[in-house]
Amino acid sequence: MQQARVRLAGTAPEDLDDICDDVREIADKTGVTLSGPVPLPTKTLEIPARKSPDGEGTATWEHWEMRVHKRLIDIDADERALRQLMRIQVPNDVSIEIVLED
């Protein structure tokens, strides 16, 4: 049977966990096997920026960072389960990718 690999990425881990719970509920209702969610390493993007807008004075820096959290879920590619997966309400800051594998 085909497997569907669901990759979730977002800046808020709470949103990712909520979507993972929704996927787990869908798997329980439809009776398909589910493995995951597997937490992948968090990427930290850091940008140093000067505090002073004109460049004069002492060199003081601010460091801005954004953390990207990722989750990985494998689920059997049942037609009913995939249709329900497509109907999940996904927040704007979460990206979801579904890939079918043999």
UniProtKB/Swiss-Prot annotation:
Protein name in UniProt: Small ribosomal subunit protein uS10
Transport is among the record's keywords: no
An example Gene Ontology CC term for this record: small ribosomal subunit
One example of a Gene Ontology biological process annotation: translation
Disulfide bond positions: none
Any one GO molecular-function label of the UniProt entry: structural constituent of ribosome
Family of the protein in this entry: Belongs to the universal ribosomal protein uS10 family.
Protein function: Involved in the binding of tRNA to the ribosomes.
Entries under InterPro entries matching the protein: Ribosomal_uS10, Ribosomal_uS10_CS, Ribosomal_uS10_dom, Ribosomal_uS10_dom_sf, Ribosomal_uS10_euk/arc
One Pfam family, short name: Ribosomal_S10
